[in-house]
């Protein structure tokens, strides 16, 4: 009985996804044809015939973070009253899409937190980051959202995020190649205690 219900639910889910993908592809087709007409390109030539479908598929994958919640991404949370030292995930590489120009920005994110009682696996931190990088973003908000999600889900004594990224909307449109933008978000002890901040920054340098 349970297997039959799961099969029905899965079929319904696949139908909804297929319908959503079809709508997205039609919208991509209209957008792409308009773009080609404005720049003087022929959208019906051989190399471009399947481009709208590829655009729809690519953006569906790159922006799938909206379908996930931070709690789901973190997965299993462990209760541990012993571990109260800083935990750091250093230089996690990421890619995201700038909401202003729909061009990529990419780089690495370092995550630090001091547990109170709750711990999560390192893979959970990576998945949490993907929830927010796989959305239309600006770097400042991305950095803050990861910090706020950690505070909300793990209730740590503090959290700090440092994000360093290159923006293709800047590099491709202006003469500023390979420039890096750095943002940070500090919560709890990291905001209140300069020694805690200094310890985290030293770990990133080592």
From Swiss-Prot:
**Which cellular components does GO assign to this protein?**
cytoplasm
- Organism encoding this protein: Helicobacter hepaticus (strain ATCC 51449 / 3B1)
UniProt cross-references to InterPro entries, sorted A to Z:
GTP-CH-I_C/QueF, GTP-CH-I_N, GTP_CycHdrlase_I, GTP_CycHdrlase_I_CS, GTP_CycHdrlase_I_dom
> Which reactions fall under this protein's catalytic activity?
GTP + H2O = 7,8-dihydroneopterin 3'-triphosphate + formate + H(+)
Question: Quick check: keyword Zinc in the entry?
Answer: yes
Which keywords fit this entry according to its UniProt record?
GTP-binding, Hydrolase, Metal-binding, Nucleotide-binding, One-carbon metabolism, Zinc
Protein name according to UniProt: GTP cyclohydrolase 1
Q: Name one GO molecular function term.
A: GTP binding
Pathway stated in the Swiss-Prot or TrEMBL entry? Cofactor biosynthesis; 7,8-dihydroneopterin triphosphate biosynthesis; 7,8-dihydroneopterin triphosphate from GTP: step 1/1
Residues recorded as binding Zn(2+), renumbered to this chain, are 98, 101, 169
Keyword Metal-binding listed: yes
**Assembly and partners?**
Toroid-shaped homodecamer, composed of two pentamers of five dimers.
Specify the domain of life of the species encoding this protein.
Bacteria
Enumerate the SUPFAM superfamilies for this protein.
Tetrahydrobiopterin biosynthesis enzymes-like (SSF55620)
**EC code:** 3.5.4.16
Which terms under GO biological process does the entry name? one-carbon metabolic process; tetrahydrobiopterin biosynthetic process; tetrahydrofolate biosynthetic process
Q: Say which enzyme class the record assigns.
A: hydrolase
Task: Describe the family membership recorded for this protein in Swiss-Prot or TrEMBL.
Answer: Belongs to the GTP cyclohydrolase I family.
* Gene transcribed to yield this protein: folE
Pfam name, any one: GTP_cyclohydroI
């Amino acid at each position: 009985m349970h297997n039959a219900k799961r099969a029905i639910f899965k079929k319904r889910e696949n139908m909804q996804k297929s319908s959503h993908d079809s709508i997205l592809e039609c919208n991509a087709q209209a957008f792409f044809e308009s773009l080609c007409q404005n720049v003087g390109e022929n959208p019906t030539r051989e190399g471009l015939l399947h481009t709208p479908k590829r655009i729809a598929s690519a953006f569906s994958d790159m922006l799938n973070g909206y379908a996930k919640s931070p709690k789901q991404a973190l997965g299993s949370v462990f209760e541990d009253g012993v571990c109260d030292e800083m935990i750091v995930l250093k230089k996690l590489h990421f890619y995201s899409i700038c909401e202003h120009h729909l061009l990529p920005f990419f780089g690495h994110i370092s995550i630090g937190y001091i547990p109170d009682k709750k711990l999560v696996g390192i893979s959970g931190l990576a998945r949490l980051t993907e929830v927010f990088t796989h959305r239309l973003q600006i770097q400042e908000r991305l950095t803050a959202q990861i910090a706020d999600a950690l505070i909300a889900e793990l209730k740590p004594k503090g959290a700090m995020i440092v994000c360093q990224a290159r923006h293709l909307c800047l590099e491709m449109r202006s003469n500023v190649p390979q420039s890096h933008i750095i943002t940070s978000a500090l919560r709890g002890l990291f905001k209140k205690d300069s020694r805690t901040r200094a310890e985290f920054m030293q770990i990133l340098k080592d």
